């Protein structure tokens, strides 16, 4: 007998009962701009735009206590695609602060008794932002034709160099221990199944975290995604069985690119892989692509201000039956980060997210700027850190980075109090890279390990490392002894981002602290986080990075920044299992333990196995200091215009919970 997940069903029954008969009674339960479009015949009535009365999503927890007001434009800074993307994200299931999931795009699910088959139920009558029906076909098509085409079915390896959009959380072990992708199949327009080879108790959490947009508009995509004999037929099944309905046309790469460009001049991509990555994974950036979000971009990415307009087919309503969102337009304004505070205080921006380094100026100007400073809670392992690529292509540097005495030496060379004062106005605290106190994974003493500055002890540790000199050359640097770099100064290049000015300042301070150790530090400045990530995907072409890893909200659910599963983790590099040419760690090495613990986590079929593997990963960091933490803080901040209502501060903010998206912007409204 199938086991219905009681929490989802109970919640659904309660909200349907409370909501029955109220949705369609009053035309004022939609934005005036939409009501005008209905009146002039350019938009269908509300009841034809949202799911059926039994299936519409009713937002009860975040409904405002005061009567909301429709309309207006909220202006905020453009912090890049990972700012405005999560801001309005709508996942299949939503992860909650306690690590459980709740219904969202999906209204519920069943799980078979053997734990292998998830049956997912969608909302009847739900539509994409262009008014076309949203069905299970869109989910099954996305999985089989957009996602797993990047995975070798026999090895589980990602087969394309830029395939960061595939996540290995759909992989489970078959009877021979081989990790294989799940099978996702169409049942009917509101139902599809996910079939695993072995149980994965956190599958829905994995979807909520790492493949939250497990859908795309098939009818819009089918002529712009390459489809040939090998595209999605790794399963050996027909188009009809995979997605229901008609089969898909054969599309060459040239045809896909031409068809995309014919849709819009904005879709001018150099190859099909880039097209799939941008329109399949980072789709929210592109005007014209249908979504399920409350607002959609209407601007070219090159515009200084990205204008996101309300989705007239948005499928959520508040407790009184008003269609969400309340705000008509969100504008994301690009400007120099140094101007954020000035523009906020002048009243030109409604919302600015900032860290501890800018707290004094924002706090002092609340009354002048007619705003309030609100707090977000961060579950960081570290807010400021640096790390070394354990797979760097040069063997002598790789051996140096792998030496734990080297990592401990550079850790205790850092004056953390000075970094705190110079970069963050003393608003943070010295800390090693470790789970914070108060979290389930906290280890007593771990945040204090190897953080007291001691230059003499650091030099003593370096003096004991074979292959590098104790003495300095004429310029004051230690050199390599033997090998290809014999007699050459040890020079370490740190990756930074131009759009994160504290990166460069931190590297300058590290250069100051490492100089007495005889280690030369230089900076490799990248234009932004995406450019830096391209080097991570390559795996072995960068040496070191600052402020790359913040840790993990929950290692069982999201180990990406602390384990060896991904192909873009800075310290693991090519030891990341997603790499098609992933390296095998040396037997008995610390990295071997991390990789094996990661494999155990990925193949775990019970919560006990998951917990054991997660504990091994945490202990690997405790014992090996893979990432060197400098400072930590459990807070970041928002300058919120007083005209923004229903903004609830104190929410947990992290990638897994989608940063500001966890404050449910669709429930905010503007009123003076």
Regions found by a protein language model. Give the residues of each.
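N-terminal lobe/hinge region of extracytoplasmic solute-binding protein
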Residues: 36-39, 44-113
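A structural "hinge/loop" feature
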Residues: 60-86, 105, 203-213, 387, ...
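Detector for C-terminal structural segments
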Residues: 216, 289, 295, 304-306, ...
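Aromatic- and charge-enriched surface segment that lines or borders ligand/interaction sites
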Residues: 108-155, 187, 193-195, 203, ...
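Ligand-site clamp/hinge motif
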Residues: 123, 279-286, 308, 313-364, ...
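Short, well-ordered beta-strand elements
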Residues: 68-80, 107, 117-120, 139, ...
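Gly/Pro-rich hinge or "lid" segments in bacterial periplasmic/extracellular proteins
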Residues: 78-79, 83-97, 208-324, 329, ...
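Periplasmic binding protein-like
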Residues: 131, 340-359, 366-372, 515-574, ...
């Amino acid at each position: 007998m199938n086991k219905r997940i009681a929490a989802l069903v109970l919640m659904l029954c309660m909200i349907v009962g409370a909501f029955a008969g109220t949705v369609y009674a009053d035309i004022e339960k939609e934005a005036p701009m939409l009501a005008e479009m209905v009146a002039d015949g350019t938009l269908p009535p509300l009841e034809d735009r949202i799911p059926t009365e039994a299936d519409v999503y009713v937002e009860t927890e975040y409904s405002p206590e005061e009567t909301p007001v429709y309309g207006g434009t909220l202006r905020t800074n453009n912090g890049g695609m990972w700012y405005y993307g999560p801001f309005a994200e709508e996942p299949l299931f939503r992860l909650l602060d306690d690590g459980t999931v709740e219904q969202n795009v999906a209204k519920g699910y069943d799980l078979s008794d053997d734990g292998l088959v998830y049956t997912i139920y969608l909302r009847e009558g739900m539509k994409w932002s262009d008014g076309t029906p949203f069905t299970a076909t869109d989910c099954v098509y996305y999985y089989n034709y957009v996602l797993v085409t990047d995975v070798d079915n026999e090895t589980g390896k990602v087969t394309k160099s830029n395939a960061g959009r595939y996540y290995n959380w759909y992989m489970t072990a078959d009877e021979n221990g081989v990790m294989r992708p799940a099978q996702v199949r169409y049942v009917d327009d509101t139902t599809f199944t996910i079939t695993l080879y072995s149980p994965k108790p956190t599958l829905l959490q994995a979807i909520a975290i790492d493949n939250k947009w497990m859908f795309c508009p098939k009818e819009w995509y089918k002529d712009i995604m390459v489809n040939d004999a090998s595209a999605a037929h790794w399963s050996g099944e027909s188009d009809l069985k995979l997605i229901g309905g008609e089969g898909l046309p054969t599309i060459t790469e040239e045809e896909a690119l031409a068809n995309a460009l014919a849709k819009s001049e904005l879709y001018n991509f150099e190859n099909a892989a880039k097209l799939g990555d941008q329109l399949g994974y980072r789709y929210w950036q592109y005007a014209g692509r249908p979504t399920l979000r409350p607002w959609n971009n209407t601007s070219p990415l090159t515009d200084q201000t990205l204008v996101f307009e309300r989705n007239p087919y948005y499928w959520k309503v508040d407790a009184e039956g008003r269609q969400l969102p309340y705000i008509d337009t969100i504008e994301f304004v690009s400007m120099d980060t140094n101007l954020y505070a000035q523009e906020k205080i002048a009243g030109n921006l409604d919302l600015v997210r900032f860290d501890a380094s800018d707290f004094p100026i924002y706090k002092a100007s609340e009354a002048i700027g007619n705003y309030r400073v609100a707090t977000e809670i961060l579950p960081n392992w570290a807010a400021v850190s640096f790390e070394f690529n354990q797979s760097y292509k040069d063997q002598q540097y790789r051996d140096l980075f792998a030496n734990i005495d080297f990592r401990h030496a550079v850790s205790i060379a850092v004056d953390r109090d000075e970094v705190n004062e110079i970069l963050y106005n003393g608003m943070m605290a010295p800390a090693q890279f470790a789970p914070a106190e108060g979290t389930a994974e906290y280890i007593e003493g771990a945040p204090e390990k190897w953080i007291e500055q001691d230059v003499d002890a650091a030099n003593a540790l370096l003096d004991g490392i074979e292959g590098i000199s104790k003495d300095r050359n004429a310029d004051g640097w230690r050199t390599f002894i033997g090998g290809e770099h014999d007699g050459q100064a040890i020079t370490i290049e740190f990756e930074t981002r131009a759009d994160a000015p504290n990166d460069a300042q931190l590297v300058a301070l590290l250069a100051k602290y490492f100089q007495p150790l005889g280690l030369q530090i230089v900076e490799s400045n990248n234009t932004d986080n995406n450019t830096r990530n391209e080097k991570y995907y390559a795996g072995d072409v960068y040496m070191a990075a600052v402020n790359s890893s913040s840790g993990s909200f929950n290692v069982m659910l999201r180990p990406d920044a602390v384990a060896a599963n991904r192909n873009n983790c800075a310290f693991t590099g090519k030891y990341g299992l997603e790499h098609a040419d992933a390296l095998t760690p040396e037997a008995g090495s610390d990295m071997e333990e991390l990789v094996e613990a990661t494999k155990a986590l990925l193949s775990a079929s019970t919560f006990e196995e998951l917990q054991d593997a997660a504990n091994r990963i945490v202990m690997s960091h405790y014992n090996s200091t893979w990432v060197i933490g400098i400072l930590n803080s459990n807070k970041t901040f928002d300058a919120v215009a007083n005209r923004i209502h229903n903004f609830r501060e104190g929410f947990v903010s992290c990638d897994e919970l989608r940063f500001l998206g966890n404050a449910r912007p669709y429930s905010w409204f503007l009123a003076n």
